[in-house]
Amino acid sequence: MDRLGGPAGAGVAFALTAGLAADAGGYNALSYDRALLVVAGIALAGVLVAGGERPGLFAATLLGALALLTAWTAASWLWSESPPRALVEAPRVALYAVVAGVVVLAGRRVSPAWIAGGVVGGATLVAAWNLVVLVQHHGRAQASGVLADPFGYANGLALLCALGIVLLLRLPRPALVAAPVLAADLALQESTGALAALAAAFLAYGLLTRPRLRRVLAAVALAGVVAAPFAFAGHLRGRYWRAALHESAAHPVGGSGAGTFANWWLRERQVPFSTREAHSVYLETLAELGPLGLALLLAALAVPLAAAVRAREPALAAALVGYDVGAAVDFHWELPGVTVPMLFVAAAACVRASPPQAPARRTVMVPAFAVVTACALLAYAGAARLAGAEDALRVGDQARAAADARAALRVAPFSADAWGVIGDAEGSATAYRRAIALDRNDWSLWLRLANVSKGEPRRLALREAARLNPLASGP
């Protein structure tokens, strides 16, 4: 079993990296709920068959931070501006915690080289896939909307390529055959943030491996930090970040609730651009989950970096630095297709930094993963039914849309989106009111209610929609 640990670990890392990246980066709830169900099932089966290793100090801290961040994300339902979104966002963080848990349980049976190899393999496959798509759509990739296929977001695909390039430093020389594919795709995505992340990663690698150059490299790093604000001067991201800071100031304790930045942006924006994300994991977490949420996030990111340095794994440390820099200027935390590979690396570094541990107790691990698997099954069932309802609505099958939405409500009674689909399918003001009762700050629900109302109810609904989204063009 121990001999199979390395290849099995690499296979899981490869499959999740490639699978999530190919599924539009894992951005949608259906994608990450499905991944959570699969990974939790793998963890449960692994514990039952082969047991696992207890986490050392670094690994326990990482897992604790991710578990608490998951709980805090879900708990923000209690005070959120849009409570249903907290329960939609929480499974994504749970996926991150379970992925890290799988690597930690595998312990020293899976070396960092196997993990790095799996991530690089998955990244290379997706990069090659994208290059084929770009060749097929030569000269019209951007116009046809396939520039970042299958990942779906150019900056996310570019960061995945950058992480793959950095992790090649941990692999034997023959693995460098992947470098041209990764580098070419990184260049074609034209992502300034990913290039900055790659530069930061190489600087970190140099600082850890070239003692004589540390002063020079430190000076270069400092110059980059000083220049960063000027690089983003006048950029739309600056507006997102200011909105996030204003959101944080308005909710200084617990934040406004997971997934609510989109509401805040629509109310505050001065330009007719829409976004669901603040394009900075640190500012968005502070705005939505408050100082405690940010502290848990920073712990989850900083502890593995410290572990990689302690374990003398410069390539792993460099990859983690690259992700941390990239996530500062984009919404990569919401993209499991790039965050899950990072967490494979993070957990491997934590395992490497501690001495071998005693076997984990099955009496603790089996019930824990059984509960997570059951919760994942419920989340996936609700997301799948809702996705089916939305698909049916798009093709004009109102009866099936309403039926699937009601089925979604049986496992996710908190879903305002499901009631919204019922309202769309049946033209039902009652359904829209049920949705609004669950999420009063979704401007689109008020607008849709106005479209099926008359007289004073219509006027009041339009007024509320305009308050929540002043720059909307109207019904």
Describe the residue ranges of each PLM region.
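TM-adjacent membrane-interface loops and short helices in multi-pass inner/ER membrane proteins
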Residues: Y153, R239-A278, Y282-L296
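Alpha-helical transmembrane segments of multi-pass inner-membrane proteins
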Residues: P7-A24, L36-V47, L66, T70-W77, ...
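C-terminal luminal/periplasmic domains and tails of membrane-associated envelope-modifying transferases
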Residues: A387, D391-P475
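Hydrophobic alpha-helical transmembrane segments in integral membrane proteins
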Residues: A228-R239, R361-R400
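A juxtamembrane structural motif centered on a specific transmembrane helix
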Residues: D2-R3, A311, V345-A381
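Structural signature of alpha-solenoid helical repeat scaffolds
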Residues: S191, A376-L377, R410, A437
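N-terminal membrane topogenic signal
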Residues: M1-V12, F58-T61
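Short, hydrophobic transmembrane alpha-helix segments
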Residues: A21-D33, V49-G56, S82
